[in-house]
From Swiss-Prot:
Taxon lineage: Bacteria, Bacillati, Actinomycetota, Actinomycetes, Micrococcales
Record's keyword annotation contains Kinase: yes
Presence of the UniProt keyword Cytoplasm in the record: yes
InterPro entries, sorted: AceGlu_kinase-like_sf, AcgluKinase_fam, ArgB, Asp/Glu/Uridylate_kinase, Glu/AcGlu_kinase, NAGK-C
Keywords, in A-Z order: Amino-acid biosynthesis, Arginine biosynthesis, ATP-binding, Cytoplasm, Kinase, Nucleotide-binding, Transferase
Protein name: Acetylglutamate kinase
Amino acid sequence: MTTEDTFETAERAAAIAKAAALIESLPWLKTFHDRIIVVKFGGNAMVSEELQRTFAEDMVYLRYAGLLPVIVHGGGPQISAMLDRLGIQSEFRGGYRVTTPEAMEVVRMVLTGQINRDIVAAINKHGPLAAGLSGEDAALFQGRKRGAVVDGEAVDLGLVGDVIGVNPEAVLAQIDAGRIPVVSSIAPDIDEPGQSLNVNADAAAAALAVALRAAKLVILTDVAGLYSDWPNRDSLLSKITARELRELLPGLESGMIPKMAACLAAVDGGVEKAEIIDGRIEHSILLEVFTQSGIGTEVAPV
């Protein structure tokens, strides 16, 4: 066999492998065609330019493949960095960050004016596909102040809230127009008109997924998935039911509780499946949606 023959054989094998990968996605293309998938964008993927680029590519691929992606994002590290840059001291009470009116101005500026714009711009490099929204727009989210109890005493966290209602019309209008909605995790305070609240992006994504009757909620994290016995790496769970997660939730590492609670809220609210996946892996969304094995941890109703 000549060198040229060897090269052609290698090329043919590579082409066949690519075709096999495409065919593997066929059942999922059928399953999720014209279905909404809510993706919570966060973690290291938000601060790595390369991961931002591949995330944007994944969203564009989903849209052109006939799926209906919706993005919800937070921005804790970027908010902290901007507060430090502006010389605004962060206040903590019982381990919780207090969001003062001054800090809330920074939260709005960073989430809606910086991060949201950056995500939209990254997607729109591939065409006029993405449209930015704030949770304040058309009262998309409705929030109520959240308190905390520390050492038996009530603690005022300032302008921190929970999402207690969703008006999905603004998002649905963007979907109907063929766009990818990108939503920042801010909510108007229903008890104090004109006031905005900083809400947890995982919880906001779950609430929106329920309101949109999404087929799937995907939360990007900085770990491979849920571990039943962290830090034992062999305890990674590929799948867990809502009942099993409800039992496991109180004992989880604190950073995982909001994410897994969001997954639980989503499936309890009618979302068919929820996943946490490792956002540090390039094209992690495509690997999760379009491969048989998927990645991360899937939460199923039963």
